[in-house]
Amino acid sequence: MAQEGQDIPTFKCVLVGDGGTGKTTFVKRHMTGEFEKKYVATLGVEVHPLIFHTNRGAIRFNVWDTAGQEKFGGLRDGYYIQGQCAVIMFDVTSRVTYKNVPNWHRDLVRVCENIPIVLCGNKVDIKDRKVKAKSIVFHRKKNLQYYDISAKSNYNFEKPFLWLARKLVGDPNLEFVAMPALLPPEVKMDKDWQAQIERDLQEAQATALPDEDEEL
């Protein structure tokens, strides 16, 4: 199985969301990607090559991280151009970061059009959750995939990448055969809490969408 070179299928993955939602923490969990990251000075971004091993061979996501530029307004189109997939992240302890998800989605699809997108609610290890599962409906309206994640505990780290890999390769049965080397968890997910948030999410997904036509 190839480790280096251009023979690994490689996809540009754009990582967006408000500042402070944990995007950089998330992408830095993957140890080899952090070690091999490249800085693109013209755009002020870090590109992390995240390799995953699947039952069809290795796959690489070149994950573009904004390095905090989003705090100064929108991102330049060069960040999005040739993006083949995307992760939009918000912080479940901050309602405003979820309210801004439609803006990030709009910017993404304006440049990238019809690419697979995963919405991630980060920091679910924190019990003081402000954005409840039942409030998270944007992905259902726009046909995106959604995952609760906790970057600091590694909870569901691989899920967004597995979903994107299946879409990009066109194989719904694609599986990761080994987990990448991740940094040790900084926090532990409480097992009862984890079971609770998984139940809440299942219930929310089974609930009909509200009739009103508002974005959120």
From Swiss-Prot:
Site note Essential for GTP hydrolysis, residues: 69
GO molecular function per UniProt: GTP binding; GTPase activity; metal ion binding
Superkingdom of the organism of origin: Eukaryota
Region Switch-II, residue ranges: 68-84
Binding residues for GTP: 18-25, 36-42, 68, 122-125, 150-152
One GO biological process term: intracellular protein transport
UniProt remark on cofactor binding: Mg(2+) interacts primarily with the phosphate groups of the bound guanine nucleotide.
Quaternary assembly: Found in a nuclear export complex with RanGTP, exportin and pre-miRNA. Interacts with tamo.
Name under which the protein is recorded: GTP-binding nuclear protein Ran
Species per Swiss-Prot/TrEMBL record: Drosophila melanogaster
Gene from which this protein is expressed: Ran
